[in-house]
Curated annotation (Swiss-Prot):
This is Molybdenum cofactor sulfurase. Sulfurates the molybdenum cofactor. Sulfation of molybdenum is essential for xanthine dehydrogenase (XDH) and aldehyde oxidase (ADO) enzymes in which molybdenum cofactor is liganded by 1 oxygen and 1 sulfur atom in active form. It comes from Drosophila melanogaster. The modification N6-(pyridoxal phosphate)lysine is found at K246. The modification Phosphoserine is found at S734. Keywords: Molybdenum cofactor biosynthesis, Phosphoprotein, Pyridoxal phosphate, Transferase. It catalyses: Mo-molybdopterin + L-cysteine + AH2 = thio-Mo-molybdopterin + L-alanine + A + H2O.
Length: 781
């Protein structure tokens, strides 16, 4: 187990704590430094005092302001260990604006192409829309760091080649904290890319594709430089994009684009120009001249000069609170501090297990926490239940907020990283964003039990080991010592304390009715009702459920135990008819109305579970259709006509075996971990009501429940037989379903629960017909 070694001395830590006393005053633990770090109290005080002491006005008016801005410009270069001889500093609104500036002004030439890494911030993806020049390619991280060429010389100057290709990647992944080795910068500048990546778009002919162009590197350093040193003498990307609030917490609204001398040679001013970027522009003629100074050509309009001046106190505060030592610089010390906290947290999380041995969390990282040059101060994970199913990150956000812990959940504007770490293929992404309707920034956290994002914890220089321990204690107390319903009740009781977005998430914590399945013909396939559909209830169960059955020539009910092909008969309930389908071309219909059917129909008697049932024969035509398709002579279709009561409590029943409804928890099905699609496994259990809860098999503890306000009594668990071994899509048998349930239930064959509707307490002569709707909230008593 990792022991934590503090980077800061006791006196240094005491001074830092004093600067952030507002955290203790607000009983807050702040763990989203990858979103923004926090500003020190003396930092904003000093910035305000500077504004009070000086007359700082438009830099076009006041030389003092210009001097301040130049001072900041030189301080930025010093911070990254470079000089104005090697890099220009262009002020922007933020890192996103810097990326946009590169996309707008980079000269691709006639054959240059744009390459970007899959695990990039959304802003890098946005560059694609500005660079539709020749070709756009997506690289996976291993195609950048794994496809290196041996460096064989110095970085060449701009050559006579016809194209310039641009590769953009993040120095540190803001999802996981993984750092791409920066040695690849020089190697790619010299030798180009070994592989171009996946082609997304191209206007080039085959002969011009992937030509040996000159390669330039745009480094998205926003996440990296917040807690890590970037030495631009050692690594020389052509463009560096960053936001200062990530480093200092204050001010916001100012970032920078650093452009190397090499990068400047292929940086062409776009058509637009603003105030301050030109020597002159005639209104009467299409004539203008750009400024000679490189950075002035690209800083359109008045700079955010007050914010820029405020950066000086950011640099001073950082250097004062985390002073350089003989061995390490300020940023190296911060990097060591946040990495140590991340390593400690990751190790502690790995130690957390449920009583049955299941790990509490699923961690997402590439190289572990052994080397701070490859991993930053970020830990990404999802929480799992005792059965192995995932807890939605929205619930974690709610629980954390109620414990005063501020962290981040979702995909963090990095869908590519989400896709990689969660193992989502392209179809899964479509299922999340196009079919299920998730959008960036929402709390739509689980689809079919699989996470759509993660929980991210990230550290800054003011984060303490006590902060990390409070997070660990929250996870232990909430997810190792309590049950899902207890957590939900806790969140609901405290919901008014949550911010608005999380209040909306509280409404999603309760399980909901996902699907209803009506089986009009006993032992045949289901007619399914899904979101947002509703269905009426009768005093026997779901309307039309198990109202028909097929009998053999001896009048005995035919089930899948004798004829698995029954599952291939698919019913469709229409306005006035029940249509039966077998295969693609064979269909037949019978009337839904008993009045239409009863006129010329013979009455018959059969048995269900040893109980006699009365039925109406549906005629020769459908009988012949059944016999031909199932390959059995003498089959008849009967419809229940008389009342049938259970032997136990006289509840009214259709042709079901035991109770009015069979409820299934999709989370329990998921725990079986079969290789077949989840919906196919759900179909095996032939349930009427399908819900999805926070943990598997919790339905076995229910005594009563309500769905959309309709009350149900739990009759008990469903004891399973080998019927569940039949694949309801194909009719094929496979024994592993039964053996897996037996193993999970320690020899018992229970899966799903029987429930019965509690009659309405009403004195109306004709009570209103009740409906259930997919999406109805399930409340457990």
């Amino acid at each position: 187990m990792t022991s934590y070694r503090p980077e800061f001395s006791a006196s240094e830590q005491s001074q830092i704590d004093a600067e952030f006393s507002r955290l203790a005053s607000n009983k807050s633990v702040y763990l989203d430094h990858a979103g923004t770090t926090l500003y020190a109290e003396s930092q904003v005080t000093a910035a305000a005092e500077q504004l009070q002491r000086n007359v700082i006005c438009n830099p076009h008016t006041c030389r003092l302001t210009g001097d301040f801005v130049d001072q900041v410009r030189f301080k930025i270069l010093e911070f990254f260990n470079t000089t104005a001889e090697d890099y220009h500093v262009i002020f922007t609104a933020n890192a996103t604006a810097a990326l946009s500036l590169v996309a707008e002004n980079f000269d691709f030439g006639s054959s240059g192409e744009f390459h970007f890494c899959q695990e990039n911030h959304t802003s890098v993806l946005g560059m694609r829309e500005r660079v539709r020049e020749n070709g756009i390619y997506m690289l996976r991280e291993n195609e950048i760091s794994g496809g290196k060429h041996k460096a064989n010389g110095k970085v060449h100057e701009v050559s006579g080649k016809t194209g310039n290709s641009l590769l953009t990647f993040s120095a540190q992944c803001n999802f996981s904290g993984y750092k791409i080795p920066l040695e690849v910068i020089e190697q790619i500048q010299i030798d180009g890319l070994a592989k171009p990546g996946k082609e997304l778009w191209s206007s080039l002919g085959e002969k011009k594709k992937n030509m040996h162009n000159d390669y330039y590197i745009c480094l998205d350093a926003a996440s990296f430089v917040a807690t890590s040193p970037l030495d631009l003498q050692k690594y020389r990307p052509d463009y560096v994009c960053l936001s200062f609030y990530k480093i200092f917490g204050y001010p916001t609204g100012v970032g920078a684009l650093l452009v190397s001398r090499r990068g400047a040679e292929v940086f062409q001013k776009r058509r637009f120009f603003g105030g301050g970027t030109i020597n002159y522009a005639y209104p009467h003629a299409m004539d203008y001249q750009l400024r000679e100074t490189f950075h002035q050509r690209y800083e359109d309009g008045t700079l955010p000069f007050l914010s820029i001046v405020g950066l000086l106190e950011g640099f001073r505060t950082l250097e004062r609170l985390v002073p350089r030592t003989d061995e390490f610089s300020t940023m190296e010390r911060i990097s060591r501090h946040v990495f140590g906290l991340a390593k400690y947290l990751e190790d502690q999380l790995r130690q957390l297990h449920h009583p049955n041995g299941e790990p509490l969390v699923k961690l997402y990282n590439k190289v572990g926490y052994q080397d701070k040059s490859r991993q930053g101060g970020i830990v990404a994970f999802n929480v799992r239940t005792e059965s192995g199913s995932f807890v939605g990150f929205g619930e974690i956000a709610c629980v954390a907020a109620l414990h005063g812990i501020l962290l981040r959940t979702g995909c963090f504007c990095n869908i590519g990283a989400c896709q990689y770490y969660l193992g989502l293929d392209e179809d899964a992404l479509d299922a999340i964003y196009k079919r299920a309707g998730r959008i960036c920034g929402d709390y739509f956290d689980l689809i079919d039990g699989q996470p759509t994002g993660a929980v991210r914890v990230s550290f800054g220089y003011m984060t303490t080991i006590q902060d990390v321990d409070k997070l660990l204690q929250m996870l232990r107390s909430s997810y190792l010592a309590t049950k899902p319903l207890q957590r939900i009740q806790f969140i609901e009781e405290q919901a008014e304390q949550l911010p608005p977005l999380l209040k909306e998430r509280v409404q999603l914590l309760r399980p909901k009715l996902l699907q209803m399945a009506i089986y009009p013909v006993k032992s045949c396939a289901a007619f399914k009702i899904e979101l947002p559909g509703s269905w009426p209830l009768t005093d026997q169960g779901l309307k039309y459920d198990r109202e028909w059955m097929i009998v053999d020539m001896n009048g005995m009910a035919l089930t899948q135990k004798r004829c698995t092909e029954l599952c291939l008969i698919r019913p469709v309930i229409k306005v006035d008819q029940l249509e039966l389908q077998f295969g693609e071309n064979s269909t037949i219909s019978v009337p839904l109305s008993l009045d239409d059917q009863a006129a010329d129909t013979a009455k018959c008697v059969s048995k269900v579970c040893r109980q006699p049932v009365e039925g109406l024969d549906c005629g020769d035509r459908v009988a012949q259709w059944l016999s031909e398709n199932l390959g059995m002579e003498g089959l008849r279709l009967l419809r229940q006509s008389g009342q049938r009561n259970s032997s136990k409590d006289q509840q009214k029943l259709s042709l079901v075996n035991q109770a009015q409804f069979l409820l299934l928890n999709k989370s329990s099905v998921r725990s079986l971990q079969f290789e077949e699609p989840l919906d196919e496994t759900v179909d095996r259990f032939r349930a009427n009501i399908i819900i999805d809860t926070g943990s598997a098999f919790e339905e076995l503890t229910y005594k009563a429940l309500s769905i959309g306000g309709i009350q149900f009594q739990v009759e008990g668990p469903c004891q399973r037989c080998d019927m569940i071994c039949i694949n309801q899509r194909t009719g094929e048998r496979s024994p592993e379903t039964l053996t897996t349930i037996s193993r999970l239930q320690k020899g018992r064959m229970r899966f799903g629960i029987y429930i019965t509707r509690i009659p309405q307490d009403t004195k109306e002569l004709e009570p209103k017909e009740q409906h259930m709707t997919c999406g109805d909230v399930v409340l457990v008593e």
